[in-house]
Amino acid sequence: XXLKGIPTDEEQATGLEEYA
């Protein structure tokens, strides 16, 4: 995932926003 709780474009598209 991305850093600092910010999901990448792919993660947002796939719904993997477990960092938000």
UniProtKB/Swiss-Prot annotation:
<comment type="function">
    <text>Component of the cytochrome c oxidase, the last enzyme in the mitochondrial electron transport chain which drives oxidative phosphorylation. The respiratory chain contains 3 multisubunit complexes succinate dehydrogenase (complex II, CII), ubiquinol-cytochrome c oxidoreductase (cytochrome b-c1 complex, complex III, CIII) and cytochrome c oxidase (complex IV, CIV), that cooperate to transfer electrons derived from NADH and succinate to molecular oxygen, creating an electrochemical gradient over the inner membrane that drives transmembrane transport and the ATP synthase.</text>
</comment>
<keyword id="KW-0472">Membrane</keyword>
<dbReference type="GO" id="GO:0005743">
    <property type="term" value="C:mitochondrial inner membrane"/>
</dbReference>
<keyword id="KW-0496">Mitochondrion</keyword>
<comment type="similarity">
    <text>Belongs to the cytochrome c oxidase subunit 5B family.</text>
</comment>
<dbReference type="GO" id="GO:0006119">
    <property type="term" value="P:oxidative phosphorylation"/>
</dbReference>
<protein>
    <recommendedName>
        <fullName>Cytochrome c oxidase subunit 5B heart, mitochondrial</fullName>
    </recommendedName>
</protein>
<feature type="region of interest" description="Disordered">
    <location>
        <begin position="1"/>
        <end position="20"/>
    </location>
</feature>
<keyword id="KW-0999">Mitochondrion inner membrane</keyword>
<comment type="pathway">
    <text>Energy metabolism; oxidative phosphorylation.</text>
</comment>
<comment type="subunit">
    <text>Component of the cytochrome c oxidase (complex IV, CIV), a multisubunit enzyme composed of 14 subunits. The complex is composed of a catalytic core of 3 subunits MT-CO1, MT-CO2 and MT-CO3, encoded in the mitochondrial DNA, and 11 supernumerary subunits COX4I, COX5A, COX5B, COX6A, COX6B, COX6C, COX7A, COX7B, COX7C, COX8 and NDUFA4, which are encoded in the nuclear genome.</text>
</comment>
